[in-house]
């Protein structure tokens, strides 16, 4: 197989797409042998079914098929397309591609991150605590590509009404409770965007940075991320993972990629999915994604959760300032967004059973979805994310 990587950034997008074909075929075969996908199931106590939980713990991932209804996905797609249309032309710009005021300027943190098409903005840099030590191939596009494209978006709960409702989805929260305990807490959320033929790469990495040397370390100490897929994504555009790597501690990623001879890791598998599928990936899993030279539109709504015990008493990491301290007050304030999201969903889907979030039990009346709580609890909620 052709060796590609940070020293091979003169390959064309067309040739890179072709070079992936045998790797994709083999990856799909490996994924099919593992399985780890199917509809979500719960036991009589409302907990994630044991066979699914065991499969998740063994491999570090699962693909829940048909998780979000087609009607809800359509609402999410509609809002997402509007947000992409209203994106600034570059980071820090005030106008969109039509010359209108760009969306999101009222929020404390920028909503959008834009990058050069087909680039790997974090790979080989010290961004995000240096957790992306290698860089993916960045193929050359043609002259018709835009200068910048949307790569990621922050603040799903404040920029999308449907996103806030999704955050209160009872099945998502029931899974979080099963894995992280009834007092589970939020991590953060982000939207990864890989538009057809221009989407950027996310180089191989493990998400967690805080607890690698903890005396209480175990495979779940850094939590997990859901990704709700808004569109069908093939193995050429989706996330790839190295099964079982969440059990191995902090990995020498540079050595793994070097020993492999290319960024196409031999044992990795693709988490290809349909619109409405939801993937769950342990944050200690080695994972990444390649530039999107395919015709797929990939938009992944990423929602993370932790054990409370992993977060309490810790200081900021990743996108949070190092002097941020995760005390009871900060954890409680950030967790209130879950309660407001549950009520927002309940108002919109009145016939759907609501999830009972134990940390907010008894405070439901004060955490209703209304204009006051949108201003007090939801707006700029991501300033209180709990990254570890």
Segments (PLM) and residue ranges:
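Non-heme Fe(II)/2-oxoglutarate
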Residues: 2-42, 86, 117, 252-254, ...
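Non-heme Fe(II)-dependent double-stranded beta-helix
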Residues: 2-58, 65-204, 210
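A structural signal for short, well-ordered beta-strand segments and their strand-loop junctions
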Residues: 63-66, 185-188, 238-241, 280-281
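Short helix-to-loop capping/linker segments positioned immediately adjacent to catalytic or ligand/cofactor-binding
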Residues: 163-164, 174-175, 212-216, 228-230, ...
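A structural signal for short, well-ordered beta-strand segments
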Residues: 189-191, 226-228, 301-305
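Short, structured patches in soluble enzyme cores that scaffold and shape functional sites
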Residues: 190, 195, 206-208, 228-232, ...
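Acidic, His- and aromatic-enriched active-site or binding-groove loops in soluble protein domains
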Residues: 203-223
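Double-stranded beta-helix
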Residues: 220-224, 228-290, 310
């Amino acid at each position: 197989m052709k060796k590609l990587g940070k020293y091979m950034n003169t390959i064309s997008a067309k040739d890179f797409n072709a070079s992936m074909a045998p790797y994709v075929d083999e990856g799909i075969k490996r994924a099919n042998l593992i399985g780890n996908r199917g509809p979500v199931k719960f036991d009589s106590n409302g907990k994630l079914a044991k066979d699914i939980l065991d499969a998740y713990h063994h491999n570090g991932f699962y693909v829940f098929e048909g998780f979000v209804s087609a009607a809800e996905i359509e609402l999410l797609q509609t809002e997402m397309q509007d947000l992409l249309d209203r994106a600034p032309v570059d980071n820090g710009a005030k106008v969109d591609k039509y010359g209108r005021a760009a969306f999101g300027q009222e929020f404390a943190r920028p909503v959008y991150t834009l990058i050069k098409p087909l680039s790997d903005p974090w790979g080989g840099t010290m961004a995000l605590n240096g957790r992306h030590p290698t860089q993916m191939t960045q193929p050359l596009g043609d002259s018709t590509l835009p200068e910048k494209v949307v790569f990621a978006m922050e603040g799903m709960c404040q920029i999308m009404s449907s996103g806030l409702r999704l955050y209160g989805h009872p099945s998502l929260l029931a899974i979080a409770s099963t894995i992280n305990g009834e007092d589970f807490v939020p991590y953060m959320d982000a939207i990864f965007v890989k538009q057809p033929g221009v989407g950027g790469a996310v180089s191989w990495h493990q998400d967690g940075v805080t607890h690698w040397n903890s005396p209480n370390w175990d495979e779940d100490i850094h939590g997990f991320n859901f990704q709700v897929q808004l569109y069908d994504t093939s193995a050429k555009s989706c996330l790839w993972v190295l099964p079982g790597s969440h059990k191995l501690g902090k990995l020498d990623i540079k050595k793994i990629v070097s020993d492999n001879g290319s960024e196409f890791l031999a044992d990795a598998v693709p988490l290809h999915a349909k619109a409405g599928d939801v993937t769950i990936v342990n944050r200690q899993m080695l994972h990444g994604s390649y530039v999107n030279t395919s015709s797929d539109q990939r938009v992944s709504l990423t929602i993370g959760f932790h054990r409370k015990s992993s977060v309490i008493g810790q200081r900021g990491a990743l996108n949070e300032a190092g002097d941020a301290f995760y005390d009871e007050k900060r954890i409680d304030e950030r967790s209130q967004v879950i309660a407001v999201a549950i009520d927002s969903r309940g108002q919109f889907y009145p016939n759907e059973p609501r999830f009972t979030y134990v940390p907010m039990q008894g405070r439901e009346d004060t955490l209703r979805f209304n204009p006051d709580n949108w201003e007090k609890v939801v707006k700029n909620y991501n300033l209180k994310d709990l990254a570890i």
